[in-house]
UniProtKB/Swiss-Prot annotation:
PANTHER family the UniProt entry points to: PHOTOSYSTEM II D2 PROTEIN, PHOTOSYSTEM II PROTEIN D1
Listed Gene3D superfamilies: Photosystem II protein D1-like
Protein name: Photosystem II D2 protein
Family as reported in the entry's similarity comment: Belongs to the reaction center PufL/M/PsbA/D family.
Superkingdom classification of source: Bacteria
Entry binding sites for chlorophyll a ChlzD2: H117
Gene for this chain: psbD1
Record-listed a plastoquinone binding positions: H214, F261
Subcellular location: Cellular thylakoid membrane
Keywords carried by this UniProt record: Chlorophyll, Chromophore, Electron transport, Iron, Magnesium, Membrane, Metal-binding, Oxidoreductase, Photosynthesis, Photosystem II, Thylakoid, Transmembrane, Transmembrane helix, Transport
Gene Ontology CC: photosystem II; plasma membrane-derived thylakoid membrane
Amino acid sequence: MTIAVGRAPAGRGWFDVLDDWLKRDRFVFVGWSGLLLFPCAYMALGGWLTGTTFVTSWYTHGIASSYLEGCNFLTAAVSTPADSMGHSLLLLWGPEAQGDFVRWCQLGGLWAFVALHGAFGLIGFMLRQFEIARLVGIRPYNAIAFSGPIAVFVSVFLMYPLGQSSWFFAPSFGVAAIFRFLLFLQGFHNWTLNPFHMMGVAGILGGALLCAIHGATVENTLFEDGDGANTFKAFEPTQEEETYSMVTANRFWSQIFGIAFSNKRWLHFFMLFVPVMGLWTSSIGIIGLALNLRAYDFVSQELRAAEDPEFETFYTKNILLNEGLRAWMAPADQPHENFIFPEEVLPRGNAL
């Protein structure tokens, strides 16, 4: 009698087949994250290119915003929906457009389309970094760092208008449109005096400074291990030895500042921490603006400036500038409100 000892082959279902195909080694890795990333990124970019090329903002903002109307790259934009649309998702088949594509574009449906697909596309890109890090066998700090840009995008384009009356008050997708939004935040929220904005500026500019210092220090302390005109060709990705002298760099900065990094791991974590923390804190600040929270109001200075014409500080000057931004900007920015301000209430500088 013959006895066969072995393990029955496990049945492979459709999930295993799909998992193998998604994770196959190819020029552009797909992965499970790609099922979210690639369609959403394609839709967001395609919607933005379509909107900036063909779609007007006449019905939502009373302005031209496309190449077809004469705008250029800096002035074209996919504009936010009309204020009357509230926080509707503006689905093409929804009650606002009722399947009419042209009407959907006129109402600002492309903005909601680009914003939502863009947000999920960014999340898909972060998941892509998680997925590849796990497959390669490294830690997922790239994905954690990318949470900073995601937090900024979601807070600025989604959370802020959700706290306001409608999507209308979100930034439109365009260069000059973003500049308009920055002026709006300053005029209506005094954003530059917000401590979360200050932390964001410190993080981003501090990160740029750290990047420049680190790159320059490494270039300064490269080992002279090549005969070429430059040292770039002397480096091999698989070499075991160091390519620059950490000891020399530490000695240099110890002489400059009296203190210096002596641990490469702590140094690079600090370079990760500073800009990402700046992005996170600025995102928290934007959510505060969505709720119309005030930051620093130095009322005592405002009261004294109102009583004493000779008393003025940079704070009181900025408050007057903000009033000017609101008074001059609102009629042009919100034409549907039909704001009409009498000449005597419009703030003017001393020179006028």
